[in-house]
Amino acid sequence: MSEELDEEVLDGLTEVEKLYTVFHGASQEDVAYAKLFWNSLSLQPPIESRLVSSDIRQRLKVAKTPNTTNAAANQAPWSKRNEEIQQDAYLRQKQEEKQRYMEMAKNRDQIIALLKKQRDERIKKEMIAYKHKPKKGKLEEKRLAPKTLSSDVDEDQKEVQKLQ
């Protein structure tokens, strides 16, 4: 019986399969059984890696038909009133926000105008001082000059803070 199995297996194999499957030092019966085993064995991927599962629970449910035309027509009058109230509140909020931004822009313009005025006054004072500045000044005059200017700067800073 083993000889018949060997002959059937060897006859069924193609030339390529005969060349690539080599069993040296084994009996013909063992070679036939090994070839039959390796030819019948096919590795399947694990269940987790399959794209589609045969499990019924995994299938998607069928989408329901939308009935939006009836829902819009059957809308209650109180819901329309509610939408109007929400729209009014939204518009009021936008108006308040716009007004707040306008006030901030106005304050910004006032601060910029004050800073420009202070800059112009400072430049004017520097031009006057430049004309009368001695070429070689004493150290005491240099020390006293920043103190007198600092009082003007403090007043200007206080005015800017009041505007903010």
Swiss-Prot record:
- Where would you find the membrane-spanning parts of this chain? none
Primary location group: cytoplasm
Q: Which InterPro entries match?
A: HOATZ-like
| Places the protein is found | Cytoplasm; Cell projection, Cilium
Q: Which GO terms describe its biological process?
A: cilium assembly
Report the superkingdom from the record. Eukaryota
Gene Ontology cellular-component terms for this entry are: cilium; cytoplasm
**What family does the entry list?**
Belongs to the HOATZ family.
What this chain does, per the entry, is described as: May be required for motile ciliogenesis and flagellar genesis.
- Record-given protein name: Cilia- and flagella-associated protein HOATZ
| Provenance organism | Danio rerio (Zebrafish)
Q: What is the lineage of its organism?
A: Eukaryota, Metazoa, Chordata, Craniata, Vertebrata
Q: Which gene encodes it?
A: hoatz
